[in-house]
């Protein structure tokens, strides 16, 4: 990361978008994204290309802007306060790349025409095809049909939801983006509405859809079999894996090479449980897994400011938020002998504030020999997420960890603070 930021005004200021909704999202998010790109040493041409793609293909997907009193048009718990997206820095070997994600929202979301906000993701992917005409649609089309509720089946389904907050808890779809050498899209599907409509368990629907995918899934069979085995505990009351949602990559010339990820969630926050998740309840005990586990444990304690003498079988102090807990995933790669585990450390729910999270990350970077990141991270965080008048416009939400080829991959996810709607609202 860099020592100082250039003036980003030329690329983001004075840009006029087609309507007030898109203008709001651009004015709120483009300055943050631009500062992140500069901070991460993207070339000027790359910055321009990414911001252009963001303006033309991502900004429209955010949908209607918040109301004049700040209420989001479509509320979802992709962040703790319904902000419909995140931005992130991915750190690996002292290098930094920029990514972002959001919940595509169609203008009719929440109406009888689109009660569960399912149409936004389909519309956005079709729009992105204009920029990436070689993007293979096979897997997207398959999972869309498997996981999205058909229009004729949505009638009366909302009345069957098990809890009042179900619309916010079930993020039916989300899109993630990285940008180099060309934009690549990651699609997330949570099929709980479809499972409710079919009267089956959500995880059973996910496994059935994956197993019925056919030839594209054959090269993942070893890892799939292992994960499905984890649906049964090794001992009474032990850890089991039941997928909550999935994601997969889309891009040009990726017909059968898209990574597939299966996500789980737990409200248990003791280290011993995290260890079970990372090792598939000790089904994985190879040397690389053990090395990764040791590095994860160090980051877990540093990011959450956990004392060294904390009981590994004791949960963290409880957080009252409805979605508090730990998300994790298993990445499947072709012909791999084992899945790659990723743990999302929930610093917003269980951490001690941005200052302590920064302190923990800096200590972790130092321990990995990432000296440049250790030196610049606090300064760059403030530079990216502060306005000229000193207001902070972002906070840490999660820190993810995975371990590949004997190296850690760490991603810091941030919730951007949007500009006050009343400052941009056009009546």
From Swiss-Prot:
EC category name: transferase
Domain of life of the source: Eukaryota
Keywords, sorted A to Z: Transferase
Coiled-coil annotated spans: none
InterPro entries in alphabetical order: Aro_prenylTrfase (IPR033964), Aro_prenylTrfase_DMATS (IPR017795), DMATS-type_fun (IPR012148)
GO biological process, alphabetically ordered: alkaloid metabolic process
CDD domains with a match to the protein in the record: PT-DMATS_CymD
GO molecular function, one term: transferase activity, transferring alkyl or aryl (other than methyl) groups
The keyword Nucleus is annotated on this UniProt entry: no
E.C. number: 2.5.1.-
Keyword Protease: no
Binding-site positions, L-tryptophan: 77-78
Pathway: Secondary metabolite biosynthesis
UniProt: substrate binding residues: 99, 186, 188, 259, 261, 263, 344, 409, 413
Function according to Swiss-Prot or TrEMBL: Indole diterpene prenyltransferase; part of the gene cluster that mediates the biosynthesis of the indole diterpenes penitrems. The geranylgeranyl diphosphate (GGPP) synthase penG catalyzes the first step in penitrem biosynthesis via conversion of farnesyl pyrophosphate and isopentyl pyrophosphate into geranylgeranyl pyrophosphate (GGPP). Condensation of indole-3-glycerol phosphate with GGPP by the prenyl transferase penC then forms 3-geranylgeranylindole (3-GGI).
Annotated family: Belongs to the tryptophan dimethylallyltransferase family.
Name of the molecule in the record: Indole diterpene prenyltransferase penD
Gene that this sequence comes from: penD
